[in-house]
Amino acid sequence: MLSNYNKDKGGKGQLMSKNKLLFLPFIVAIIVTLIFLAAQIPSAKVNPKHLPVALVNEDSGEMAALIIKNLKDNAPDAVEFIEYHSVKEMKKGMNDRKTYGGLVIPSTFSEQLAAIQTDNTPVYLDIYINEGVNTNVATSMETSLNQIVSTISSNASKQIIAQLQQVADQMGETVGAQLAKMNEQGGKKEEAADLTTMISPVQPTKVELLANPITATVTKVNEVGKLGSVPSALFVPLWIASIIGAVMLYLAGTKRPFENRIELTKFQLIQSLIPIIFGFFTGYLITWYSTWMLGYEFESFNTVALFASIAVIAFVYMILSFVVWLRLPVLAFFALFIFFGLPLIQLVPEMIPSFYGNYILPWLPIRFLVDGIKEILFFGEGVMNDYTVVLIWIAIGGFLLLWVRNLIKKVESKKE
């Protein structure tokens, strides 16, 4: 009996040990779903804080100063108002991505507001939207600033109506006094006719204007036009092509026997130069594909293609250097960049949760690709912008790491 029990127990143990892979799908499901859902946290928990909005007051009136003060004192947590001395200074801040929108009070604001009772022209406030930073933020920023202008207009309307009510009350008292005097002395018809013009200080045609005296004019800075989706569209194919290129170059030299150090060095030299050729080929090819298949029309095709080529060169060197040191399993780390990077590049830093903003975003090399394309397409920069310099340094670092590994690699002789 005991021997049979031990046999059964041993058989079950062998069965379990031989079928460990049966539990692998459950483990993979736990890990993969956790990673993919964690990558969506920035998009699911968008909580904008301190989005920079410019304020420019070109008017010297008390009303304009009061508007600026009230906006700064009552700013919500999602917005941070920053004062600029001029529209030119504000636009420079927008080009430097320091502000996403702006509200400008023109120099004629107080004058036009004071003359609105006699003039049929509405008073204007100028809204500026920095569309090139992020199209989603630009849309919400335009809506928010229009709501602010609507609130300012409503408050101004109440003040104007209150002033007109005081004038009407004074006129009523004057008319009452005149009528009483006419009743006592016997008024003339001509005098009674003149009193009809004093009954209401507001012409019927101005009622709608006085109800909404202030309107907004919207000016978009660094417009995206039909190219708003280009950074996201180019990011995935360029990154995947870089991973594939690096893997192919690595596999070309694995377990390949060499007769001597000279033969190995020749191969390593070719291997370290091919990323440059591959980068230009891939960068121009994908950029051309985007014009052919997606219908993008670039102002300068060569500028976009050249920047894309530099990005691919940098990424291939970086990935290849990691692979030669840490082997193929490190590719999983770079593959995750797609899932974690895509939600992050669609948001501005002020909308990203603090953990992702502090510990993940700074280590995403793909953000230099996305921001560099934005600089070229929306901000009027050339190929050599700040992000290009970073990509070049990434390429240099990857190249050096690759050659450090090459120099310490031992020669594997050919087997007879």
Segments from the language model and where they lie:
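Extracytoplasmic/periplasmic domains immediately adjacent to an N-terminal transmembrane anchor
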Residues: 3-228
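Membrane-spanning alpha-helical segments of multipass transporters and channels
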Residues: 272-277, 285-416
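Juxtamembrane interface at the cytosolic side of transmembrane helices
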Residues: 243-284, 288-293
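Long, hydrophobic alpha-helical segments
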Residues: 230-250
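Membrane-water interface at loop-to-transmembrane-helix junctions
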Residues: 221, 225-237, 262-277, 325
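Loop-to-helix transition at the N-terminal end of transmembrane alpha-helices
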Residues: 53-56, 264-270, 303
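Actinobacteria-biased recognition of intrinsically disordered, low-complexity terminal regions
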Residues: 1-3, 416
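Juxtamembrane loop-helix boundary motifs flanking transmembrane segments in multi-pass membrane proteins
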Residues: 11, 79-82, 86, 208, ...
